[in-house]
Amino acid sequence: MQTSTKTYCIIGDPIHHSLSPAMQNAAFAAKGLNCTYIAFRVPEAELKESIESLRSINIAGFNVTSPNKAPVMKYLDELEDSAKKAAAVNTVNNIEGIFRGYNTDVYGFIEPLRKRQVDFRGMHVLLLGAGGAARAVVAALAEQKGVAKVVIANRDMQRAEELANLGDGSGMKCEVMPLAGAKDVSPMCDLIVNATTLGMKNESSVIDYQNIQKGSVVYDMVYRPLVTDLIENAKLAQASVVYGYEMLIEQGAKAFEIWTGLSAPRDAMKKNLLGIFGEPT
């Protein structure tokens, strides 16, 4: 590696599944940049020491994934508005030694819905999960006009309540329920979002196709495998689907732009990912 090479990375645990290195390295190559992007496994218990190590090597920037999106905030120097609203960080830029945190998941989540011209007015949303990814969903939905209600279904009810309070503070009506009961409310929902890791290991979804409304939108943030059980069920129910890779590209593109100041080569990023996945049918 040349001394002038800028190094970026992603930190989380587990990390072996991450496609961010392949996608971002494809983006750097497409723009002819002397940059490289690697993955580091960082459990939450080792987060403080890992951030200190990244400072010591003068890392150019990095992404943060589960379980570190909320805990990392206290080790950063500055937070951009998106990170404050989501109370979570997924992107950090090193600005002359200042670690500034952003949440590009907020933009990354909403952009595929905007492209589909989804109407949020009067919308009832079912959100599965209450972790860092779910925080970005709530922050993104709070910026849309007219969302009627968000039901947060999660195993840990305390975390669900904390997220509901975040949503309520943004002017949205939020309710909580156990994850196991999600199928009871899903038939009444216009948008179903999976912000858990359920499906990453080919697990069955907590919502089967009989409990998905025809014409609703089902959004699975899991991107590997490309087609999860929830996505399969959504297709059977004749719902519209949003794939996790779409959010991955958009949040990654925004991170790329923060780091480089250049427009992201989205086509190259998408081509790289779909070369790994294969085109969805």
Predicted segments with their positions:
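Phosphate/diphosphate ligand-binding glycine-rich loop within oxidoreductases
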Residues: 2-116, 225-227
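Short, conserved loop/helix-junction motifs that constitute active-site signature segments
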Residues: 2-4, 120-121, 144-146, 207-216
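Residues at the starts of beta-strands that form the adenosine-phosphate
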Residues: 7, 36, 124, 148-149, ...
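Glycine-rich adenosine-cofactor-binding loop
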Residues: 12, 101-103, 121-143, 154-159
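Conserved beta-strand positions in the Rossmann-like core of class I SAM-dependent methyltransferases
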Residues: 38, 151, 242
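NAD(P)-binding Rossmann-fold cofactor-contacting core
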Residues: 144-170
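Rossmann-like adenosine-cofactor binding region
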Residues: 170-241
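Adenosine-phosphate binding glycine-rich loop
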Residues: 221-281
